[in-house]
C-alpha cells in the first residue's frame, strides 16, 4: 500500500494510523459495472441510514470520478466507485446506488463540471438530494440552527455541495479527526492507497503530483456532512419533538357537588384556585 511514502512524514493521516488501516482492508464481495469499478462490501440493510458522496470529474484524461457510500451511524464504508465515466453516466449511477441504499442522502460536489451530474439527479426527481445554502462561506450547523434556517424550504438553497477554499480545509480537519480516533471502518485498498499519497504541500492537503485524491475527498465530504447537515436535520427533529411535548392539553375536570364545586385545578402541581369570586 504505497509504503514507500511512509518515510516522508508529510502524509495528512499519520503513518501509524495508515499502517493500522492497511491491516484491515478487504476485498469487495461484489464488483459491478464495466471494468468492475463499483465495489460492494455490504449490501443495503433496510434498518440503516446511508449517505452517498459523489465527486464528479470530466471522465477523460487523468481525471477520475469518485463515489463513497457510508453507513451514517457506524461510519462503515459499504460501497465505492472510482472510474472514468462521463458526467451523465455518473449521475445515473449516483441516483441508482442512492436509491438502492434506502434512498440515501445523495451529496454531489457541484463545483465546475459537477453541475452536469447534479442536473441528472434533479431530472430524475430523486427526493433525497443534498442542498447547500446560497452565499454561505462555510456551513456551521450551530449558526444555522440559531438562525432558524429551514431545511425543507429550498428557496435559499442550491442543489449539491459547494466546495470552496474555505470549506475544503474543514473537510480535511474532519478527516484528520476521525482517522486519528480510528472511527471510520475502511475496507478499500483504493482509498487506502490514496491516503498514503495524500500529503501536506505548501500548507495544502492534496494528492502528490500525478496522483488523484477523488476517493479521499469524497470520504472527507461524508464526514463533514455527517457532522453538519445530518446533525442539523436531527436537531430539527428534536426541536419539533420538544415543541410537541410542550403543548399541553387544557383539561376541564368536573368537581363534585358540595364545598369543592367552586374550585378549579391550575398548573401541573395540583394547585387549587377558588372560583367563589365569580358568584
Where are the model-predicted features located?
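Accessory nucleic-acid engagement/destabilization modules that flank
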Residues: 159-160, 167
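Surface-exposed intrinsically disordered loops and tails
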Residues: 141-159
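RNase H-like, metal-dependent nuclease domains and their acidic two-metal-ion catalytic environment used
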Residues: 1-134, 141, 165, 169-173, ...
Amino acid at each position: 500500500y504505497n509504503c514507500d511514502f511512509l518515510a516522508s512524514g508529510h502524509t495528512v493521516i499519520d503513518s501509524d494510523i495508515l499502517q493500522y488501516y492497511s491491516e484491515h482492508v478487504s476485498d469487495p464481495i461484489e464488483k459491478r459495472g464495466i471494468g468492475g469499478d463499483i465495489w460492494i462490501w455490504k449490501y443495503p440493510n433496510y434498518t440503516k441510514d446511508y449517505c452517498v458522496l459523489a465527486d464528479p470529474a470530466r471522465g477523460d484524461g487523468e481525471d477520475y470520478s469518485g463515489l463513497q457510500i457510508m453507513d451514517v451511524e457506524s461510519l462503515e464504508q459499504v460501497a465505492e466507485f472510482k472510474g472514468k465515466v462521463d458526467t451523465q453516466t455518473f449521475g445515473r449511477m449516483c441516483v441508482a446506488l442512492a436509491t438502492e441504499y434506502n434512498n440515501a442522502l445523495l451529496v454531489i460536489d457541484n463545483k465546475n463540471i459537477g453541475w452536469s451530474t447534479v442536473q441528472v439527479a434533479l431530472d430524475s426527481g430523486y427526493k433525497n438530494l443534498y442542498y447547500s445554502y446560497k452565499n454561505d462561506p462555510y456551513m456551521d450547523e450551530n449558526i444555522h440552527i440559531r438562525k432558524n434556517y429551514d431545511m425543507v424550504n429550498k428557496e435559499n438553497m442550491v442543489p449539491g455541495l459547494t466546495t470552496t477554499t474555505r470549506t475544503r480545509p474543514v473537510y480535511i480537519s474532519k478527516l484528520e479527526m476521525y482517522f486519528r480516533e480510528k472511527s471510520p471502518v475502511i475496507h478499500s485498498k483504493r482509498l487506502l492507497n490514496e491516503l498514503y499519497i495524500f500529503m501536506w504541500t505548501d500548507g495544502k492537503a492534496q494528492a502528490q503530483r500525478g496522483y488523484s485524491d477523488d476517493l479521499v475527498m469524497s470520504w472527507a465530504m461524508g464526514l463533514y456532512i455527517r457532522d453538519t447537515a445530518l446533525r442539523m436535520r436531527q436537531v430539527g427533529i428534536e426541536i419539533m419533538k420538544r415543541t410537541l411535548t410542550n403543548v399541553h392539553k387544557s383539561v376541564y375536570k368536573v368537581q363534585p357537588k358540595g364545598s369543592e364545586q367552586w374550585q378549579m385545578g391550575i398548573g401541573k402541581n395540583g394547585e387549587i384556585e377558588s372560583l367563589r369570586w365569580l358568584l
